[in-house]
Amino acid sequence: MGMYKYIREAWKSPKKSYVGQLLKQRMIKWRREPSVVRIERPTRLDRARALGYQAKQGYIIVRVRVRRGGRKRPRWKGGRKPSKMGQVKYSPKKSLQWIAEEKAARKFPNLEVLNSYWVGEDGMYKWFEVIMVDPHHPVIKSDPKIAWIALKHHKGRVFRGLTSAGKKGRGLRNKGKGAEKIRPSIRANEGKGK
């Protein structure tokens, strides 16, 4: 087996391999860090490479922490029955991974999100690493594999649900019978697709 296959096998079931112990130590440190942190190199090299990361100028890795659970809605100031306050049982209709990608994009507005992957979780948080690309960097513009991201119609792609996590959240992995209300978009079908 090659190096990447060993890494992939270890991450398939982290608790059973050496990854579990490493994650425990890492998360103690990660909890103290800000929610969005730029890092030097990917934690899961195999996953990052599979999703398009290259170790060259113009590629940036960002680790993002997202709170687990449903959506935390703002609390009303006026009087209401507790059951009518609209505090519980509301979900954001987006995966936590998609939310993490958006957080990274807001922190680094000059970069575009390429993709992301899971790196850890505990009872309170989930961590994702987001691969970001500088569309104005000459190295990126001259690489035919990634130069497409510099085109103007890819600007703000994460906020339009065009990343892998975004497309999954919009139901675009499904086609055929049962997926009639998914395309062209959820909104075009008056929200009936979700």
Swiss-Prot record:
Task: List the GO terms this entry assigns under cellular component, sorted alphabetically.
Answer: cytosolic large ribosomal subunit
Q: Where is the composition biased (Basic residues)?
A: 167-176
Asked if the keyword Plastid belongs to this entry, the reply reads no
* PROSITE patterns in the record: RIBOSOMAL_L15E
Tell me any Pfam family this protein matches. Answer: Ribosomal_L15e
Keywords of the record, alphabetical order, are: Ribonucleoprotein, Ribosomal protein
UniProt lists the family membership as follows:
Belongs to the eukaryotic ribosomal protein eL15 family.
Q: What is this protein called?
A: Large ribosomal subunit protein eL15
Q: Source species, please?
A: Pyrococcus horikoshii (strain ATCC 700860 / DSM 12428 / JCM 9974 / NBRC 100139 / OT-3)
